[in-house]
Amino acid sequence: MSTVSSSRGSAPRLLAIVGPTGTGKSELAVDLAEELGGEVVNADAMQLYKGMDIGTAKLTTAERRGVPHHLLDVLDVTETASVAAYQRHARHAVEELLEAGRTPLLVGGSGLYVQAVLDDLAFPGTDEQVRARWEEELHLHGAAVLHRRLRELDPVAADAILPTNGRRLVRALEVIEITGRPFSAHLPKPGPPRYGAVLVGLDREVAELDDRIDLRVTRMFDNGLVEEVRELEKQGLRRGRTASRALGYQQVLAELDGAGDMAAAAAETAKLHRRFVRRQRSWFRRDKRIHWFDAARPGLAGDVRALLDT
């Protein structure tokens, strides 16, 4: 089996496949991993969680076709996801693969997680009193109010953080208060990426991707998302500060607490996914290192391989 470098005469490099949700990144990664002698390193924050399969569109074991996937199913739903911890584990996985002569494929739509691997992303300190005050604001007024406040202070960070992600909103507002600088100012300016990485972005026409999102959400509910949430409730999903706020899961939990209208939960989930796609697109389009491809184009895998050989 060949590697990325087989025609380059050098060691394999990291290939990052990024872009909005629903574009086909995971499927392309498996195709390329088979051809390049590679393994996938997950960069989707919610696919870190065990049991969160249907609602995150995690590839099944069969769909992975024997390609090893790293950093899937590594957290319990009660654990809080941390970009700093992810950075350590993902870089370790990438470096082990490179040392073994394997091609790492960093795959996902969580922009901050991707940047944590590729760039010199540092993490500002914390202030427990400031954080506690913002957590109280979250409890009293809700995540949407904090998101509006963040948009006033740092529109770039607001684009990158979901209005439902209270934990990340609190952290961003905490950093702004204790440093006196926008949260986004702590993000590194993209330069030469670590590991000599090649960055590939997938996107689709807006209407086409919206339709794909709607179909994906319909299938999630048809394929048992509500049952998955009920099972995860038994494992402490409601106590999970990160997992309980994932798109789809939060909406199902709300309906289980209320009228039980899962059609309404599905409609809200689809709407929020479409909104999330636009935020992802805005985040990734700022990174000029990314080579963009229409995910619908024929021969996509071959075109990406050709890019690696240039």
UniProtKB/Swiss-Prot annotation:
Task: Kindly provide the name given to this protein in its UniProt entry.
Answer: tRNA dimethylallyltransferase
Q: Which NCBIfam families match?
A: miaA (TIGR00174)
According to its UniProt entry, one GO biological process term is: tRNA modification
Q: InterPro entries attached here?
A: Dimethylallyltransferase, IPT, P-loop_NTPase
- List required co-factors: Mg(2+)
Annotated site (Interaction with substrate tRNA): 110, 131
Origin superkingdom: Bacteria
Residues that coordinate or bind ATP: 19-26
Q: Which reaction does it catalyse?
A: adenosine(37) in tRNA + dimethylallyl diphosphate = N(6)-dimethylallyladenosine(37) in tRNA + diphosphate
The family line of this record is: Belongs to the IPP transferase family.
- Keywords, sorted A to Z: ATP-binding, Magnesium, Nucleotide-binding, Transferase, tRNA processing
The UniProt record lists the keyword Transferase: yes
- Functional description taken from the UniProt entry: Catalyzes the transfer of a dimethylallyl group onto the adenine at position 37 in tRNAs that read codons beginning with uridine, leading to the formation of N6-(dimethylallyl)adenosine (i(6)A).
User: If you read the UniProt record, what top EC class would you report for this enzyme, in one word?
Assistant: transferase
Task: Describe, as the record does, how this protein assembles with itself and its partners.
Answer: Monomer.
* Residues reported to bind substrate: 21-26
Specify whether Ubl conjugation is a keyword of the entry. Answer: no
Q: Name one GO molecular function term.
A: tRNA dimethylallyltransferase activity
> Which species is this UniProt entry from?
Saccharopolyspora erythraea (strain ATCC 11635 / DSM 40517 / JCM 4748 / NBRC 13426 / NCIMB 8594 / NRRL 2338)
What EC numbers are recorded for this enzyme? 2.5.1.75
